[in-house]
C-alpha cells in the first residue's frame, strides 16, 4: 500500500486506528477485501478498498433524506460512533439493544420506518438485519473478515470491533456524506475530530 494513494485520510491514519486489522477467520464473501494474511493467521484488510467503499456508501446514502437513515450498533465500541454520526448528520441512531419489532411492529412505541439502514456488524446487529430484510430496505454494513455479506447490499470492509477503527470509519462516513449533501465544502474543515467519535476506553 503506497503512502501516495489518494485516500480520504493518510494511510498511516487508517493503520494507526487499526482499520486494517481483521480476524483469524475469513469468509469467501470477504476474500476480495483481504490484502494479505500474516504468519500468525490474522487477515489484513486492504484499506484502499475500505476507503473506496466509504466513498461509495456516502454517495449512496446521500440519495436519501438524512431523517430516513437509521444507524445501528449493538457492539459497545460502535455505540458512541453511531450516536455521533447521527448527531453530525441528522440521521437516527439506535446504540445498544435493538428491540424486536422496531422495523416490523407498528404497535411498538419505538417503531421506525427508515428507507435505509447502516449496521456496525451484520452478526451483532442480526435482529436489525433480519427486520430490514423483511421490510425490504437496503442494508449498508461495516464488515470484518469473518462476516458473511449475502444479505448486505453494500459492505464496507473494516475492523468492526476496534474502538479507534469504528470511530474513524464512522467519522469519515459522516464527513463524506455531508460533502455529498452539500452541507460541507470539499476543503472545509469538519467540526468533529475522529476522537469525538471514540467510545470510552476499556474499563
From Swiss-Prot:
The keyword Magnesium does not apply. SUPFAM superfamilies: Ribosomal protein S2. It comes from the Archaea. One of its GO terms (molecular function) is structural constituent of ribosome. It comes from Methanopyrus kandleri (strain AV19 / DSM 6324 / JCM 9639 / NBRC 100938). HAMAP family: Ribosomal_uS2_A, Ribosomal_uS2_B. The gene is rps2. GO terms for biological process: translation. Transmembrane segments: none annotated. Belongs to the universal ribosomal protein uS2 family. This is Small ribosomal subunit protein uS2. Keywords: Ribonucleoprotein, Ribosomal protein. One of its GO terms (cellular component) is small ribosomal subunit.
Amino acid at each position: 500500500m503506497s503512502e501516495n494513494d489518494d485516500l480520504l485520510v493518510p494511510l498511516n491514519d487508517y493503520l494507526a486506528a487499526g482499520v486494517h486489522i481483521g480476524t483469524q477467520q475469513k469468509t469467501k464473501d470477504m476474500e476480495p477485501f483481504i490484502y494479505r494474511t500474516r504468519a500468525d493467521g490474522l487477515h489484513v484488510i486492504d484499506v484502499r478498498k475500505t476507503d473506496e467503499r466509504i466513498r461509495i456508501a456516502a454517495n449512496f446514502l446521500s440519495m436519501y433524506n438524512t431523517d430516513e437513515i437509521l444507524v445501528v450498533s449493538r457492539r459497545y465500541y460502535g455505540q458512541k460512533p453511531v450516536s455521533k454520526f447521527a448527531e453530525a448528520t441528522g440521521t437516527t441512531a439506535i446504540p445498544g439493544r435493538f428491540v424486536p419489532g422496531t422495523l416490523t411492529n407498528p404497535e411498538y412505541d419505538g417503531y421506525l420506518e427508515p428507507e435505509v439502514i447502516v449496521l456496525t456488524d451484520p452478526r451483532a446487529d442480526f435482529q436489525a438485519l433480519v427486520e430490514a430484510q423483511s421490510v425490504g430496505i437496503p442494508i449498508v454494513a461495516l464488515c470484518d473478515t469473518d462476516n458473511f455479506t449475502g444479505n448486505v447490499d453494500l459492505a464496507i470492509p473494516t475492523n468492526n470491533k476496534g474502538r479507534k477503527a469504528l470511530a474513524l470509519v464512522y467519522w469519515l462516513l459522516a464527513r463524506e456524506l455531508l460533502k455529498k449533501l452539500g452541507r460541507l465544502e470539499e476543503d472545509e474543515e469538519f467540526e468533529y475530530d475522529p476522537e469525538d467519535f471514540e467510545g470510552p476506553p476499556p474499563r
